[in-house]
Amino acid sequence: MTKEKKKTGIEPKVFFPPLIIVGILCWLTVRDLDAANVVINAVFSYVTNVWGWAFEWYMVVMLFGWFWLVFGPYAKKRLGNEPPEFSTASWIFMMFASCTSAAVLFWGSIEIYYYISTPPFALEPNSTGAKELGLAYSLFHWGPLPWATYSFLSVAFAYFFFVRKMDVIRPSSTLVPLVGEKHAKGLFGTIVDNFYLVALIFAMGTSLGLATPLVTECMQWLFGIPHTLQLDAIIITCWIILNAICVACGLQKGVKIASDVRSYLSFLMLGWVFIVSGASFIMNYFTDSVGMLLMYLPRMLFYTDAVGKGGFPQGWTVFYWAWWVIYAIQMSIFLARISRGRTVRELCFGMVMGLTASTWILWTVLGSNTLLLMDKNIINIPNLIEQYGVARAIIETWAALPLSTATMWGFFILCFIATVTLINACSYTLAMSTCREVRDGEEPPLLVRIGWSILVGIIGIVLLALGGLKPIQTAIIAGGCPLFFVNIMVTLSFIKDAKQNWKD
């Protein structure tokens, strides 16, 4: 019994370092918020201006890697000997479900405003040209390019899972072919895993920092409860307690049902916005934006604005590429797990087409609605942001729709459920990654899951206390830097091992 407990307990070398590092950073931040904001601005400026080009080249190289997988020697290779575990329709639906987080609802509703008010290519703010390019840039940041990079890593993890039969819960497990077993299981592998976990903790904290204000603003609109930082903290605490109860009482089936409800409700809410906002305008704007994307794509891919120094690519493209990089391993492991039995070509095409369709639908519908409300002077987003914050501006884009009370209830429920499932997924992923071994069908220890959910909640509160989007953007970019190198190593390890062991 003691041996079994030891086997399934925490792995100290990957549990305590991230806990200590994140704890110290949170403590230093809370000690002096003003000094923390100065450091945040300096880190953001350094990484985006000095290393922004590296993120852009990474995405381009991975896109070529996607073409190599689709048309190269591994295209028809099957990821496992079994037939596909899920039907194609269910597989695509599960992909869509992974795209409907509250953080995505946050950016989908407000992103276009920033692109129009501070446009790229020295365009005039709020001009026709800026509006024509606004949605095109959203389609660029949330389109085939990042999903192609994810598909490459998903193939890599699926290969290690189903072809090489490796039990991969941390990235170091995949690096044996590249650096050897001694280094992968030694100090080097431990450092890699700690980089991954620290970055993942901050990424999840930022998602919570984006999602929570949406829920509290909904509560203010529906119930008249003033939105304060204290209310944000109370809501996060309630989510953590609810997650602990679900885990302790074995209510994971209920969480799964909630996740399904989130997906169906997302379809319903998007359909409602599409119909009442103006379906013909949305389709025309989308069509025009695809054309703009194709016309400007080469410029977008390599745009650093080194001469003009307007800051658009640093504030948005580099930020989003870091966002994609930081979530790459977690998302790719999930997408690989549900793709057993697929061929490499099926996985690559399915991900790019299915997931691009999901994000394009979200951004087109929500972004078009925001643009229409701005053009018709129904809402004044700059004033709302200045007086009440970004979350209030997002809420008003939903409240301006017909049947506003019913719409707001739907949005409130969607955001609430999305955040509950987010915290559940966060605690599960971090607990799995910091335990010695969890067999199939077993759950990671309860206290470990609760502990990680508390830490993620604390990070969300700290980021909310700092205020604005810059701390959230900086947390993503700073975390994306080490994961940038980890993702490259996982990719190279897959290529090396596949050449040796995945032959006809």
Swiss-Prot record:
It comes from the Bacteria. Pathway: Amine and polyamine metabolism; carnitine metabolism. It is found in: Cell inner membrane. InterPro entries: BCCT_CS, BCCT_transptr, BCCT_transptr_CaiT. One of its GO terms (cellular component) is plasma membrane. The chain crosses the membrane at residues 10-30, 51-71, 92-112, 143-163, 195-215, 231-251, 263-283, 316-336, 347-367, 403-423, 446-466, 475-495. It catalyses: 4-(trimethylamino)butanoate(in) + (R)-carnitine(out) = 4-(trimethylamino)butanoate(out) + (R)-carnitine(in). One of its GO terms (biological process) is 4-(trimethylammonio)butanoate transport. It is a multi-pass membrane protein. Keywords: Antiport, Cell inner membrane, Cell membrane, Membrane, Transmembrane, Transmembrane helix, Transport. GO terms for molecular function: (R)-carnitine:4-(trimethylammonio)butanoate antiporter activity. Catalyzes the exchange of L-carnitine for gamma-butyrobetaine. Homotrimer. Belongs to the BCCT transporter (TC 2.A.15) family. CaiT subfamily. This is L-carnitine/gamma-butyrobetaine antiporter. It comes from Escherichia fergusonii (strain ATCC 35469 / DSM 13698 / CCUG 18766 / IAM 14443 / JCM 21226 / LMG 7866 / NBRC 102419 / NCTC 12128 / CDC 0568-73). The gene is caiT.
